[in-house]
């Protein structure tokens, strides 16, 4: 049940294979939800040779020579100066072509100079608008890219990175150790709590909360190596919105009145995105949506957004020359009255 990808070069081994079970499932769902846009999205998602990788520079071990080299290679700075909130301390570079820098190896005691990521994953971080001294919770933090990006934006008074999965928690710890200097580690707490329990454990504690929720993860699901497991995942997919809603309820409890919450996923699924946010807004009188449409207008040079069906959020969809996403982002504010 696997469709083989065409080789980029004849002598190379096949790096990835598309799982037909997943592709057929996505075809049925997303052709309805995205309309004609799905054709381009599908072409990008099923062609890893088209994928792009952004380079997030580490301000704690700044690679000046690498930055010069990126400029020479035609990379440009992400969104610099185009958003009301874009910290000068955060430097991320993009290439219009699908070029990937080599990953740095983890070496104990040596900080890495850069982190490779899907550029769209920085939008939830920017939407959170973290300021120096604030208490922030990254509820589902592994593998750590968004926690790392938050620390490129500001010096929080307290950063709580939580991850329930023990294997992913190890990955999170290694990411933080690889990029963050020891003095700053003192303001970071890493925990292994079920995210659904965080609100009861730390009620009204945080100024800002990021919920980068477990989701269908369309890019990786398309390349599932085991068709039977993929079919099982698809059948269990209907349970994800319930989990996402429970995580959001917990996050809202943990958020102080007046605080901001950003919800994000890396799936195109309306059920896991807009429908979840709509349910939250219908369930809480003290939770209000924050309009982030301006982000789409100012980011259109680097990202393509789904044109319809995103009343309370933004959905980045992969496009030709802008192969970023999927990434859904919604921003909420907790009022002082209940």
UniProtKB/Swiss-Prot annotation:
Its EC number is 2.1.1.-. GO terms for cellular component: mitochondrial large ribosomal subunit; mitochondrial matrix; mitochondrion. S-adenosyl-L-methionine binds at residues 140-146, 163, 194, 212. Signal peptide: none annotated. GO terms for biological process: regulation of mitochondrial translation; rRNA methylation; tRNA wobble base cytosine methylation. Keywords: Methyltransferase, Mitochondrion, RNA-binding, S-adenosyl-L-methionine, Transferase, tRNA-binding. CDD domains: AdoMet_MTases (cd02440). It is an enzyme of class 2 (transferase). The keyword Lyase does not apply. Mitochondrial tRNA methyltransferase that mediates methylation of cytosine to 5-methylcytosine (m5C) at position 34 of mt-tRNA(Met). mt-tRNA(Met) methylation at cytosine(34) takes place at the wobble position of the anticodon and initiates the formation of 5-formylcytosine (f(5)c) at this position. mt-tRNA(Met) containing the f(5)c modification at the wobble position enables recognition of the AUA codon in addition to the AUG codon, expanding codon recognition in mitochondrial translation. This is tRNA (cytosine(34)-C(5))-methyltransferase, mitochondrial. The lineage of its organism: Eukaryota, Metazoa, Chordata, Craniata, Vertebrata. The gene is NSUN3.
């Amino acid at each position: 049940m696997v469709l083989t990808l065409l080789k980029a070069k004849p002598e190379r081994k096949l790096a990835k294979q598309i799982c037909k079970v997943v592709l057929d499932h996505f075809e049925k769902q997303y052709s309805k939800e995205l309309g004609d846009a799905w054709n381009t999205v599908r072409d990008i998602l099923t062609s890893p040779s088209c994928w792009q990788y952004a380079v997030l520079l580490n301000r704690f071990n700044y690679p000046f020579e690498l930055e010069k080299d990126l400029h020479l290679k035609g990379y440009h700075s992400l969104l610099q100066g185009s958003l009301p909130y874009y910290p000068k301390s955060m430097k991320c570079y993009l290439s219009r072509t699908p070029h990937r820098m080599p990953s740095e190896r983890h070496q104990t005691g040596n900080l890495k100079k850069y982190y490779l990521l899907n550029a769209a994953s920085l939008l939830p971080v920017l939407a959170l608008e973290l300021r120096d001294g604030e208490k922030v919770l990254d509820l589902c933090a592994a593998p750590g890219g968004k926690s790392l990006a938050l620390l490129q934006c500001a010096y929080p008074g307290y950063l709580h990175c939580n991850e329930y999965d023990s294997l992913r928690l190890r990955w999170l710890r290694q990411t933080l150790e690889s990029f963050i200097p020891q003095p700053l580690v003192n303001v970071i707490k890493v925990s292994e709590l079920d995210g659904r329990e965080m609100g009861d454990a730390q009620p009204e504690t945080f100024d800002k909360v990021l919920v980068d929720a477990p989701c269908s993860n369309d890019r990786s699901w398309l390349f599932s190596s085991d068709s039977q497991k993929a079919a099982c995942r698809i059948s269990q997919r209907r349970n994800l919105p319930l989990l996402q809603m429970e995580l959001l309820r917990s996050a809202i409890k943990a958020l102080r009145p007046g605080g901001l919450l950003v919800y994000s996923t890396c799936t195109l699924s309306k059920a896991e995105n807009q429908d979840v946010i709509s349910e939250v807004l219908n369930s809480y009188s003290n939770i209000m949506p924050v309009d982030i449409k301006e982000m789409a207008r100012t980011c259109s040079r680097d990202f393509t957004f789904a044109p319809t069906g995103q009343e309370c959020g933004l959905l980045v969809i992969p496009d030709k020359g802008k192969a970023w996403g999927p990434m859904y982002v919604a921003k909420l504010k907790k009022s002082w009255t209940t």
